[in-house]
C-alpha cells in the first residue's frame, strides 16, 4: 500500500515513522509512505497557502489551489481514497480501518490546519472525511498518524501473529478481555484461576463473558439491544 500525507508540517512525521511497527513495515516493504507539502505548490514567492474567509470571521482558511495541486502531483494507484482529517468528519471506527486496509492500494491523507479548508476541497477533492472524535486539535497531523498506525498494522506482513488481531478490542464489536502475565500473584492480586487451568474451552468461555461484561459496562453502544 502507498500512503501519501499532504501536510504543512512534514517534520511532524519524521520520528513516528522511524519507530516500532511503522518503521518495520516501511523497511519490510509492506507500505510506502510519502510526504508532500502544499507550500511547494503555492503560487507566490511567499508560499502562501491560506487566506481570510469570504463573509468574514476569525482565523485563516487553507486555499484550494495548493491542496489540489499537491494531490494532483501524486501518482495514482487505483483504487485510491483521498481522506480529509477534520472534526466535521465521520468518527473513525475499526470497521473503516479494515475496509481501508483491504480495499485500497493508495491512501492520500489531507491534514487540515488553521480554521479549516476551503469547502471546494471537501466537495471536489476528498472522497472521505474522518474525525478522531468530538474534540478539536490544532491540525490533522495527529489524526493522520492514528489512521496510519491503525491501517498499517492490519496489512499482511506487519503483525507476526495475525490471530492476535482477531481478539482485539472492537473486533466483533466487543472490547478485549482482560490480559494477565507473570507473576500469577502480584501484591496479593491474583490471576483468575481459569487462566491457569490449561482448559482451553473454559478459558475461551471466560474470555467471551469478560468481553461482554466489559463492553456492557464501558461501551454499551457497541452492543445490539438484545445482547
From Swiss-Prot:
It holds the Pfam family tRNA_m1G_MT. The keyword Lyase does not apply. Keywords: Cytoplasm, Methyltransferase, S-adenosyl-L-methionine, Transferase, tRNA processing. One of its GO terms (biological process) is tRNA N1-guanine methylation. It is an enzyme of class 2 (transferase). Its EC number is 2.1.1.228. It is found in: Cytoplasm. The keyword Lipid biosynthesis does not apply. It catalyses: guanosine(37) in tRNA + S-adenosyl-L-methionine = N(1)-methylguanosine(37) in tRNA + S-adenosyl-L-homocysteine + H(+). One of its GO terms (cellular component) is cytosol. S-adenosyl-L-methionine binds at residues 112, 132-137. SUPFAM superfamilies: alpha/beta knot. Homodimer. Specifically methylates guanosine-37 in various tRNAs. HAMAP family: TrmD. Belongs to the RNA methyltransferase TrmD family. NCBIfam families: PRK00026.1, trmD. This is tRNA (guanine-N(1)-)-methyltransferase. It comes from Gloeobacter violaceus (strain ATCC 29082 / PCC 7421). The lineage of its organism: Bacteria, Bacillati, Cyanobacteriota, Cyanophyceae, Gloeobacterales. The gene is trmD.
Amino acid at each position: 500500500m502507498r500512503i501519501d500525507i499532504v501536510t504543512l508540517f512534514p517534520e511532524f512525521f519524521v520520528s513516528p515513522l522511524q519507530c516500532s511497527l511503522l518503521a518495520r513495515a516501511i523497511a519490510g516493504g509492506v507500505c510506502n509512505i510519502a510526504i508532500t507539502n502544499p507550500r511547494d505548490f503555492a503560487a507566490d514567492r511567499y508560499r502562501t497557502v491560506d487566506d481570510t474567509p469570504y463573509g468574514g470571521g476569525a482565523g485563516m482558511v487553507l486555499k484550494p489551489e495548493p491542496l489540489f495541486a499537491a494531490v494532483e502531483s501524486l501518482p495514482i494507484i487505483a483504487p485510491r481514497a483521498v481522506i480529509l482529517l477534520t472534526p466535521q468528519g465521520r468518527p473513525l471506527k475499526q470497521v473503516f480501518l479494515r475496509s481501508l486496509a483491504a480495499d485500497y492500494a493508495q491512501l492520500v491523507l489531507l491534514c487540515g490546519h488553521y480554521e479549516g479548508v476551503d469547502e471546494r476541497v471537501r466537495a471536489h477533492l476528498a472522497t472521505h472525511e474522518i474525525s478522531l472524535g468530538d474534540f478539536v486539535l490544532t491540525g490533522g497531523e495527529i489524526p493522520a498518524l492514528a489512521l496510519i498506525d491503525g491501517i498499517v498494522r492490519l496489512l499482511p506482513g506487519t503483525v507476526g501473529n495475525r490471530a492476535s488481531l482477531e481478539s482485539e478490542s472492537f473486533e466483533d464489536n466487543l472490547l478485549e478481555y482482560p490480559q494477565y502475565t507473570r507473576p500469577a500473584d502480584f501484591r496479593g492480586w491474583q490471576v483468575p484461576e481459569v487462566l491457569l487451568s490449561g482448559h482451553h474451552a473454559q478459558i475461551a468461555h471466560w474470555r467471551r463473558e469478560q468481553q461482554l461484561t466489559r463492553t456492557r459496562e464501558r461501551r454499551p453502544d457497541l452492543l445490539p439491544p438484545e445482547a
